[in-house]
Amino acid sequence: MTQTNQAPLVIKLGGAALSCTQTLSQLFGAIAAYQKSAQRQIAIVHGGGYLVDELMTKLQLETVKKNGLRVTPYEQIPVIAGALAGTANKLLQGQAIADGLNAVGLSLADGGLCHVEELDPELGAVGKASPGDSTLLQAVLNAGALPIISSIGLTEKGQMMNVNADQAAVAVAGALDAELVLLSDVSGVLDGKGHLIKTLSEQEADALIQGQVITDGMIVKVKAALEAANDLGRPIEVATWRYPEKLTQLFAGESIGTQFLPQ
């Protein structure tokens, strides 16, 4: 493998991909094939809300959300951390290993990768992550492994915290000085004629929201992506995992979705 001078790439994996073995296999297979010829360092950050929802239903625990964020009572965090840092992380790691990758399962707390503190007392054990020390993560990458990082973190006092996976990915990318792609069910932002918009600024997005081109759940995704770009201080990309043949282009630094520009 040849080392490139490209910045590392953090891929936040979300949406239905997490529950679809075939999709995961296509993604990990594409990473394995890409890394045989080029060594751009890649790390995965994941959530796993669907697993948590299933577990909460089985345990007859109520799921409450505030402004789209899951309320995590402190007494429930062991269960939620088990689902995310345990089951979801090992399912992804297992699939990556099956597809020929040397995968390492990590959390935001490992090696002090991210600092995490309580976001809002009303949300309970929900944390906000900020970039920390990437030394351990860099060592894993330098060893040729694929880090798969759950969005569970620890505070300075050792309290487990559930961090929104998009926000966790921003913090990891910040720690690594990496580029960030939010990979999901959505291919990017479409204009009024159904064509993909290649780049989007906050002003352009506001105009499209006013004109009702961007509507409903997409408004939340767009605002989150713009916030991520501002937090990171560099463009971030929203793209889909639905076209595996395009993933190699993405790993190489080409845009296949919509790039969100920081202010």
Swiss-Prot record:
Q: What does the UniProt keyword field contain? A: Amino-acid biosynthesis, Arginine biosynthesis, ATP-binding, Cytoplasm, Kinase, Nucleotide-binding, Transferase
Q: Its GO biological process terms?
A: arginine biosynthetic process via ornithine; L-arginine biosynthetic process
Q: Which InterPro entries match?
A: AceGlu_kinase-like_sf, AcgluKinase_fam, ArgB, Asp/Glu/Uridylate_kinase, NAGK-NC
One Gene Ontology term, aspect cellular component: cytoplasm
Disulphide linkage map:
none
Subcellular location(s) per record: Cytoplasm
In which pathway does this enzyme or protein participate?
Amino-acid biosynthesis; L-arginine biosynthesis; N(2)-acetyl-L-ornithine from L-glutamate: step 2/4
Instruction: Give yes or no: UniProt keyword Transferase.
Output: yes
GO MF terms here are: acetylglutamate kinase activity; ATP binding
Q: What are the site positions for Transition state stabilizer?
A: 12, 221
Per the UniProt record, one Pfam family is: AA_kinase
- Residues that hold substrate according to the record: 48-49, 70, 162
What EC number(s) are associated with this protein in UniProt? 2.7.2.8
Give the function comment from the record. Catalyzes the ATP-dependent phosphorylation of N-acetyl-L-glutamate.
Q: Which HAMAP family match?
A: ArgB
The UniProt entry's sequence similarity note says: Belongs to the acetylglutamate kinase family. ArgB subfamily.
The entry's protein name is Acetylglutamate kinase
Q: Which organism is it from?
A: Vibrio campbellii (strain ATCC BAA-1116)
The lineage is: Bacteria, Pseudomonadati, Pseudomonadota, Gammaproteobacteria, Vibrionales
